[in-house]
Amino acid sequence: MKYLAAFLLLGLAGNSSPSAEDIKTVLSSVGIDADEERLSSLLKELEGKDINELISSGSEKLASVPSGGAGAASAGGAAAAGGAAEAAPEAERAEEEKEESDDDMGFGLFD
C-alpha cells in the first residue's frame, strides 16, 4: 500500500510516469526502506496505465462495497443478575486495554 500511495502521490504532483528511484525517494523521506521486489511488481502492474483512470476505477469499486449498515446482535441480553455484577469490572478492564491500544487512533499511515 505504501508503494502505491507514493506512486499516486508522485502522479498527482505531475510525474506521469514515476520511476523506482522516484518512489524510493518519497518513501525514504518518511523513513521507509523500499523492497525492490514489491516495488518492481507494482511498477509492472501499473506500467502504461493512467493514474486518473486508476483512481476513478478504484472509486467505482469502493462505491460497490457495503459499508456498515447492520448492527451487531447483542449477545449478553439474557445474563443472570449475579453474572451482571461480575461482568461490569471485566468490561472496565477491557475498555482500559482498548484505550491503550488505540494510541494511533486507528490510523497507520503507510503500514
Curated annotation (Swiss-Prot):
Q: Which domain of life is it from?
A: Eukaryota
Q: Which Gene3D superfamilies match?
A: 1.10.10.1410
Keyword Iron present in the record's keywords: the answer is no
Region annotation Disordered: residue ranges?
Answer: 61-111
Please give the Gene Ontology molecular function terms for this protein. structural constituent of ribosome
A Gene Ontology term for the protein's cellular component: cytosolic large ribosomal subunit
Residues modified as Phosphoserine = S101
Q: Which CDD domains match?
A: Ribosomal_P2
Q: By what name is this protein known?
A: Large ribosomal subunit protein P2
Q: Name the residue ranges with Low complexity bias.
A: 72-88
Subunit comment for this entry?
Answer: P1 and P2 exist as dimers at the large ribosomal subunit.
The answer, when asked if Aminoacyl-tRNA synthetase is one of the entry's keywords, is no
HAMAP family linked:
Ribosomal_L12_arch
> Which keywords appear in this protein's UniProt record, sorted alphabetically?
Allergen, Phosphoprotein, Ribonucleoprotein, Ribosomal protein
Instruction: For this entry, list what GO says about its biological process.
Output: cytoplasmic translational elongation
Q: Which organism is this entry from? A: Davidiella tassiana
The record's similarity note reads: Belongs to the eukaryotic ribosomal protein P1/P2 family.
What functional role does this protein have?
Answer: Plays an important role in the elongation step of protein synthesis.
Against InterPro entries, the record matches this protein to: P1/P2_N_sf, Ribosomal_P1/P2, Ribosomal_P2
Give the gene name: CLAH5
Q: Which Pfam families match?
A: Ribosomal_60s (PF00428)
